[in-house]
Every structure is written in structure tokens, then in C-alpha cells.
Amino acid sequence: MKEKYITDDEREKCRKVADAFAELYEIENILVVDAGRYGFFKLQYYRPPQGFEDAITFTDSRSMFENLWEEWLDTQLFLLAKGTPMAGMGYNEIFRCLPKEKQEELMNRKVGFAKTAGIE
């Protein structure tokens, strides 16, 4: 029997996490794929003809969730800052410049993603 790097339980949890962040793949140059016994791969920054510049392997759903959450949040902050004086700021600085309501709205999305993914 070939070695497995991810348990069946974690593989199912990772699949739910990947599905929860489906909207991210539509707006960002990211793809998350199930690599079977190896876990899940986040492929990022596709450049023809070489392919993806960055690949991260996940074998536990919690770290995958946190990584995709940060990616989603950073993308939202980038889009909010684009074309404004905040464009040159770092993500933390952009977040602090947002109205409290917008900050709460963004952070509530994390709760929604966690619920969809079955992460507690």
C-alpha cells in the first residue's frame, strides 16, 4: 500500500474548505486541487507557458482554511484600495482605514466561510 499524507477525514474537511472559498478562484489567479493521497494543493500565479509559480500543499483543513481566508481578505482589501490613496498601503493599514462597519462586514465573512467549511 502506498503511503498517504492526509487522512480520509482531513481530506473530506479540506474538500469542504476548498468549496467554501470557490468565489476566491473566480477573482484571483488561484486554483485549489485535490491531489489524492498527497493532500490539497493551492496553485497560484499562473504564467504561460511555465505554469504556476507557487504551489502550497495542505494536509490539514485548519491551516488550509486560514491560508485561503488570508488570501480572500487580502484580495478584498486590494480591490477596496485600488484607485484610492490607500493603494500604496499594506493590507493591515488598509483594513484600519476602513469604516468600522466595513471591517465588521469583512470579518463576518470569515464566520460565514467557517460555517460553510465546517470549521469551528
What are the residue ranges of the model-derived segments?
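Intrinsic disorder/low-complexity segments
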Residues: 19, 23, 36, 56, ...
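Short intrinsically disordered terminal tails
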Residues: 1-3, 113-120
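Negatively charged, low-complexity tracts enriched in Asp/Glu with abundant Ser/Thr
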Residues: 1-30
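Weak global preference for isoleucine
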Residues: 6, 27-30, 56, 94, ...
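Acidic, low-complexity, intrinsically disordered interaction modules
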Residues: 35-113
